[in-house]
A protein has these predicted regions:
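Catalytic cores of DNA base-excision repair glycosylases
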Residues: 34-289
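Polybasic, lysine-enriched low-complexity intrinsically disordered terminal tails
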Residues: 1-42, 287
Length: 289
C-alpha cells in the first residue's frame, strides 16, 4: 500500500516581512517652565508692572549704586550671623570675632549701603579664619552670643569654614569673582547650610553679581504687589526675580524692596498712605491693574 502524504512539516508560523515604519519617533513634550510661564503671563496681564514698581520705589528710596560691602568670607560669616537676628546684633557678634581672633591684616571698610539694617561695622581687619575654625565650639558660642542663636550659628560657622578649606586649601572666596554668577551660586549652595539667599547676598555685595537675594521683606512686598505667584516660596522667588529683572536692575530692586518692607510695607501695619505702589498693589486692591 502506498504511504500517505505527510503534508508540510508543522512548526511556528512565519511572520511576513514588514517594512520599517518611516514615521518619525514622537518626542515627548517638555513640561513648560513655570517661571518663564509666569513672567510671560505677568507681561500680558499686568503690562509694565516690574518697571512701574522699580520707578515707584526709586521715587522715595532713590537709586542706590553698588559698592563692595566686605571681603567675601567676611560677608558670608556676617550673613550667617544675621540669620533670624537683627543686623545690629549680627554686627556685635562679628566685632566680637574680630576682637577674639585678630588677623593682623589691613583694616577694611564696611559699606553697609541702604539695605543694611544696622549701624555699620567700624573699619577693621577681618578675623583670623584659621583661628576661628580651630576654636573649640564652646568658646565660639560664647564669642558670638551677642548675635543670638549662638549654638546653632557657631556650629554652622565652623562647618562652613571647614568645608571651604577642604575644597580650596584656605578660606578665601575671592576666586568666585572669576565664575559665572549661577556657577558661583551653585558652588556656594553645594556647602551644607548655605542656601540661595546667603549665596546671593555674598555674590551681590562682594562682587556685584546680578543675583537677587530674597529676605522676608523682599518676599512680603513682592507677594503683596503681585510680582510673585501666591504659592511661590522664598527660595523659588530668587529665580522668579532673575527671570523678570534685567541684570542692571537687580541690585536696585533688592535694596529698595528691603527698605520698602522695613519702612512702609511692614508686616503688621503697612503704611498705605505713604506707599507709591498702592495703585498697583493687589494687597490694597485685589483687582489692581
Amino acid at each position: 500500500m502506498a504511504a500517505r502524504d505527510a503534508g508540510p512539516a508543522s512548526g511556528p508560523a512565519r511572520r511576513p516581512n514588514r517594512r520599517p515604519s518611516r514615521q518619525p519617533t514622537r518626542r515627548k513634550r517638555r513640561a513648560p517652565d513655570p517661571i518663564k510661564a509666569w513672567v510671560k503671563r505677568l507681561d500680558r496681564t499686568r503690562p509694565d508692572l516690574v518697571r512701574d514698581v522699580l520707578d515707584a520705589l526709586a521715587s522715595i528710596h532713590g537709586r542706590p549704586t553698588w559698592e563692595r560691602r566686605l571681603d567675601p568670607t567676611s560677608e558670608l560669616i556676617l550673613t550667617i550671623l544675621t540669620q533670624n537676628s537683627a543686623d545690629i546684633n549680627a554686627e556685635k557678634a562679628f566685632e566680637a570675632l574680630r576682637a577674639a581672633y585678630p588677623s593682623g591684616l589691613p583694616a577694611e571698610r564696611h559699606n553697609p549701603g541702604r539695605g543694611w539694617g544696622g549701624a555699620g561695622l567700624p573699619d577693621g581687619a577681618p578675623p583670623d579664619w584659621d583661628a576661628v575654625e580651630r576654636a573649640p565650639l564652646e568658646e565660639l558660642v560664647e564669642v558670638i552670643r551677642p548675635g543670638g542663636l549662638p549654638n546653632q550659628k557657631a556650629k554652622g560657622i565652623l562647618a562652613t569654614l571647614r568645608a571651604i578649606r577642604e575644597r580650596r586649601g584656605d578660606h578665601s572666596l575671592e576666586f568666585l569673582a572669576d565664575l559665572p554668577a549661577l556657577e558661583a551660586r551653585d558652588w556656594l549652595t553645594s556647602i551644607s547650610g548655605i542656601g540661595k539667599k546667603t549665596a546671593s547676598v555674598l555674590l551681590m555685595f562682594s562682587f556685584g553679581m546680578p543675583l537677587m537675594a530674597v529676605d522676608r521683606h523682599v518676599d512680603r512686598v513682592a507677594h503683596r504687589v503681585g510680582l510673585l505667584p501666591k504659592k511661590a516660596s522664598a527660595d523659588d522667588a530668587h529665580d522668579y526675580f532673575l527671570a523678570m529683572l534685567q541684570p542692571e536692575e537687580v541690585y536696585e530692586a533688592h535694596v529698595n524692596l528691603i527698605r520698602h518692607g522695613r519702612l512702609i510695607c511692614q508686616a503688621r501695619s503697612p503704611r498705605h498712605e505713604l506707599c507709591p505702589l498702592r495703585a498697583r498693589c493687589r494687597f490694597v486692591d485685589p483687582a489692581a491693574p
